[in-house]
Curated annotation (Swiss-Prot):
MF annotations from Gene Ontology: 2 iron, 2 sulfur cluster binding; DNA-binding transcription factor activity; double-stranded DNA binding; iron ion binding
Keyword NAD among record annotations: no
The name this protein goes by in its record: HTH-type transcriptional repressor NsrR
Gene Ontology cellular component list: cytosol
Source species of the chain: Vibrio vulnificus (strain YJ016)
Length: 141
């Protein structure tokens, strides 16, 4: 399973925000420069993360973005579920005539559950725990 670039940058953004000292905020420009992504794409990512209440966005001169809740409470699987279309294949009878007898869809469903279970076992905070190399790379913003 491959995550969309949208989800990839959303996860990277959450990791970066979690690396900041408590209550410190950053801005979209810093995030776009850190990850080398277009500002337009990052604005969409930030807006969606704000809509989902993962981050707090503040407009204006002293505005910025920061996590809206502790990183230890944000599970990677939760973020992926919120952002990804998780239907691996289209198994509707209109699309595939073998659907009524197909055993693949059940295997794919179980594989998706296993994938998400693994991601549910990891919080954004855990990705930073004892990871000095990552913290150094994130400070380049």
């Amino acid at each position: 399973m491959q995550l969309t670039s949208f989800t990839d940058y959303a996860l990277r953004t959450l990791i970066y925000l979690a690396s900041l000292p408590d209550n410190e905020q950053t801005n979209i420009t810093d995030v776009t420069e850190l990850f080398g992504v277009s500002r337009n794409h990052m604005v969409k990512v930030i807006n969606r993360l704000g809509q989902l209440n993962y981050i707090q966005t503040v407009r204006g001169k002293n505005g910025g973005i920061r996590l809206n809740r502790p990183a230890k409470t944000i599970l990677v699987g939760e973020v992926v579920r919120d952002l990804e279309p998780l239907d691996l294949v289209n198994c509707s009878v209109e699309f595939c005539h073998i659907t009524p007898a197909c055993r693949l869809k059940e295997r794919l469903y179980r594989a998706k559950l296993a994938f998400l279970a693994e991601l549910d076992d990891c919080s954004i905070a855990e990705l930073l725990d004892d990871n000095a190399e990552l913290l150094i790379l994130l400070q380049k913003a």
